[in-house]
């Protein structure tokens, strides 16, 4: 089984763990722990799929000034690198955690990218010679501000023309326009549903209504609902309780496992397991197995 992952806004994800909660400013913390992993939503998806045994090709954009960590990571997991290199550096994001709380700093991707940049070149580079039939492409993450919001719609249409199954996980205008191209599967979270259906679903009836509205344009709909679980075409799967370390790759791991296995319970268990890992690192499969028993 071959999966292609398109990541236009990769990141180096750092997690800094403080020993206690900040008290309002001025503190100096010396006893801290820090982990760093390369990521970006589609990179997180690619990594989990590779761990599950899939053939994975990953592409999109990488800053040429600091691509070496990504090259090492992709090689480590046997993921084929078809990223386009652009001038500058790939962004670095931070998750700062302490007992009982956290905050996240997300920086913009490729702020120096020209508005004339040929964004479809990234999709075409990922596809290569397009000789693979029956593949699945996961288009995931935000877009650099220089790129048009309609890019994902163009990408979905392009990959569909190759006969590939298309999966879209984005937000805002990029997701709204991408939905118009009729992807096979989408995965918004509850808050990301608002610009798509006009409300944030909170009750069972509202999740059912949101799913029904979204399935007018998408083949299948997964709506993640944070620590409570996720809705798969209107069916709720509750998440097991875990000690949360970092939620960076939880939704990405859930989506990747669902694309791999098609099993909602496995997907929720994988997403929950990802919350126990720092900096977006993939969870051990034995942890997923254990959590699956509680789903």
Residue ranges and their predicted role:
Residues 47, 92-96, 229-233:
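Short beta-strand scaffold segments in enzyme catalytic cores
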Residues 29-37, 237-249:
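Short pre-catalytic strand/loop immediately N-terminal to key active-site residues, enriched for Gly-Thr
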């Amino acid at each position: 089984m071959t999966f292609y992952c398109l990541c236009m806004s990769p990141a180096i994800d750092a997690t800094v763990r403080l020993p206690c909660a900040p008290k309002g400013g001025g503190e100096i913390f010396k006893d801290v722990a820090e982990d760093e992993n390369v990521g970006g939503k589609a990179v997180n998806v690619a990594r989990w799929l590779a761990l599950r045994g899939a053939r994975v090709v990953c592409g999109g954009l990488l800053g040429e000034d600091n691509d070496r960590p990504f090259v090492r990571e992709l090689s480590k997991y046997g993921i084929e690198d078809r990223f386009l290199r652009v001038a500058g550096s790939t962004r670095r994001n931070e998750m700062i955690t302490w007992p009982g709380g956290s905050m996240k700093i997300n920086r913009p991707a490729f702020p120096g990218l020209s508005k004339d940049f040929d964004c479809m070149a990234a999709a075409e580079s990922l596809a290569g010679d397009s000789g693979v039939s029956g593949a699945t492409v996961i288009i995931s993450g935000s877009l650099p501000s220089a790129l048009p919001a309609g890019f994902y719609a163009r990408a979905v249409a392009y990959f569909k023309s190759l006969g590939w199954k298309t999966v879209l996980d984005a937000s805002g205008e990029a997701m709204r326009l991408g939905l118009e191209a009729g992807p096979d599967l989408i995965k918004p979270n509850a808050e990301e549903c608002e610009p798509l259906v006009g409300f944030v679903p909170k009750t069972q009836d509202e999740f059912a209504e949101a799913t029904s509205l979204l399935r007018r344009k998408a083949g299948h709909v997964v709506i993640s609902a944070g620590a409570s679980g996720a809705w798969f075409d209107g069916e709720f799967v509750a998440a097991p309780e875990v000690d949360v370390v970092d939620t960076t790759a939880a939704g990405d791991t859930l989506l990747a496992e669902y694309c791999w296995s098609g099993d909602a319970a496995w997907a929720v268990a994988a997403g929950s397991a990802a919350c126990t890992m720092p900096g977006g690192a993939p969870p051990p499969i034995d942890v997923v197995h254990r959590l699956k028993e509680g789903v």
